[in-house]
From Swiss-Prot:
Keywords: cGMP, Cytoplasm, Nucleus. It comes from Aedes aegypti. Interacts with Pde6. The gene is PrBP. It is found in: Nucleus; Cytoplasm. GO terms for biological process: sensory perception of light stimulus. Pfam families: GMP_PDE_delta. GO terms for cellular component: cytoplasm; nucleus. Belongs to the PDE6D/unc-119 family. PANTHER family: RETINAL ROD RHODOPSIN-SENSITIVE CGMP 3',5'-CYCLIC PHOSPHODIESTERASE DELTA-SUBUNIT, RETINAL ROD RHODOPSIN-SENSITIVE CGMP 3',5'-CYCLIC PHOSPHODIESTERASE SUBUNIT DELTA. This is Probable cGMP 3',5'-cyclic phosphodiesterase subunit delta.
């Protein structure tokens, strides 16, 4: 990354925050979990306590509400689901243009792995992390890690 990219990345990061996250059953729209926390902070490992029933859903609708001071040409995120540090799944989401000085809600649907590939919650509990990298085009804005606990 060049000097201009680093400066742009820092400028976007300073004015960027996650306001809240909601996970819903994609089929019924029922809220399964929500948290009013800035999960974009890169300096800590965040924790999320998610109801165990989320593992039984066919698909989950994720809503991210975020604010940005700076405009973004191509806001996107890459997510890696890791089990004990090894990648189990990887997803790529692209939102596109984001206007400056706005608050936005971004909804995405994530389909579950086939049941034959699912592990029991007691094995997953505390051993799964979701690593999310937020980008504007190819410029990394922030990378966060969330450890999952199933309740």
């Amino acid at each position: 990354m060049g000097t201009d990219d680093v400066a742009r990345s820092e400028k976007i990061r300073e004015g960027f925050q996650i306001n809240w996250l909601i996970l819903r059953d994609a089929d019924t729209g029922k809220i399964i979990w929500q948290e009013n926390k800035d999960f974009s902070c890169p300096d800590v490992e965040h924790e999320a306590r998610v109801p165990i029933k989320i593992l039984d859903l066919r698909a989950v609708s994720r809503e991210i509400n975020f604010s940005t001071v700076e405009s973004m040409e191509n806001f996107r995120l890459d997510q890696k689901v890791l089990f004990k540090g090894r990648i189990m799944e990887e997803w790529f989401f692209e939102m596109g243009w984001v206007s400056p000085n706005t608050t936005n809600t971004w909804q995405s649907t994530i389909e579950a792995a086939p049941e034959s590939q699912m592990m029991p919650a007691k094995v997953l509990n505390g051993n799964v992390t979701i690593e999310t990298s937020f980008f504007d085009g190819e410029t990394l804005i922030s990378k966060s890690v969330v450890r999952l606990y199933y309740t």
